[in-house]
Amino acid sequence: MAVQQNKPTRSKRGMRRSHDALTTATLSVDKASGETHLRHHITADGFYRGRKVIG
């Protein structure tokens, strides 16, 4: 089993954690219905970029 030889510094710990931050989902408002949805995804009622694509 690998065991560290020296205690990692606070700086190294912070550098390792630098990529762990969470980001909020980017939302868009549909042109046709005014509904909020995830970017590059269709809305719940089937619109994408102002066009009806499903149903």
From Swiss-Prot:
Keywords: Ribonucleoprotein, Ribosomal protein. One of its GO terms (biological process) is translation. Transmembrane segments: none annotated. The keyword Ribonucleoprotein applies. InterPro entries: Ribosomal_bL32 (IPR002677), Ribosomal_bL32_bact (IPR044957), Ribosomal_zn-bd (IPR011332). Residues 1-28 are annotated as: Disordered. GO terms for molecular function: structural constituent of ribosome. The keyword Aminoacyl-tRNA synthetase does not apply. GO terms for cellular component: large ribosomal subunit. Belongs to the bacterial ribosomal protein bL32 family. PANTHER family: 50S RIBOSOMAL PROTEIN L32, LARGE RIBOSOMAL SUBUNIT PROTEIN BL32. This is Large ribosomal subunit protein bL32.
